[in-house]
Design a protein with these regions (language model features):
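Glycine-rich flexible loops
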Residues: 1-185
Length: 185
């Protein structure tokens, strides 16, 4: 289906098929997060790049086991406006995910938990604490992740990218310490 902006994206029926086809990756990643005690603090978010946009966990969904209706198709982000299909709002970190995918066309998935790093792991950390959900955080994170597949968002959590969601989540598991949750209100 060609949309008004000239970009070809899936129609609503195909969006449901895409979500159903990718749902197992979200479940497998959630199991890894849960098994390693990383579904703590204020959670985090998961996303997968798909034709015409991204699939991302909804705002308020639990990383310990998202439901099918908590996977949202985002088809466009412009400035602070997010265009999506789904019964729930996409994650507040959608802008950050979108900007990472724009900067890294080689990656297809992002895993993010609100947990600090293991002491023995060396990890690039953002210099400043930047408010979550902002374009500033998206720009800083996207720029840093041009040269690495994992980083620590200062006082926020670990984020990792890879070719699929399970592999991105394995990187998060390798670096994240479940005894260091970040809780946002």
């Amino acid at each position: 289906m060609i949309w008004n902006d000239g970009v070809e994206r899936p129609d609503p029926v195909n969006i449901n098929n895409i979500i159903e086809n990718k749902f197992n990756e979200f479940i497998e990643s959630s199991k890894l997060i849960e098994r390693n005690g990383l579904a703590v603090g204020s959670g985090g978010n998961l996303s997968i790049k798909v034709p015409g946009g991204i699939l991302i966990t909804s705002s308020g969904s639990q990383l310990s086991g998202p439901k099918l209706d908590e996977i949202i198709f985002v088809f466009y982000v412009k400035a602070n406006d997010i265009y999506y299909c789904g019964s729930k709002k996409p994650s507040s970190e959608t802008i950050m995910h979108w900007m990472i995918y724009e900067n890294r066309p080689d990656i297809k998935a992002i895993s993010h938990v609100n947990v600090g790093p293991k002491d023995e792991k060396e990890i690039i950390t953002s210099k400043d604490e930047i408010t979550w959900g902002t374009r500033e955080l998206g720009e800083d994170t996207a720029n840093t992740l041009q040269n690495t597949n994992v980083m620590m968002l200062k006082n926020h959590g670990i984020i990792a990218v890879d070719k699929n969601l399970v592999d991105a989540t394995k990187i998060v598991v390798e670096y994240a310490d479940n005894k260091k949750p970040y809780i946002f209100t």
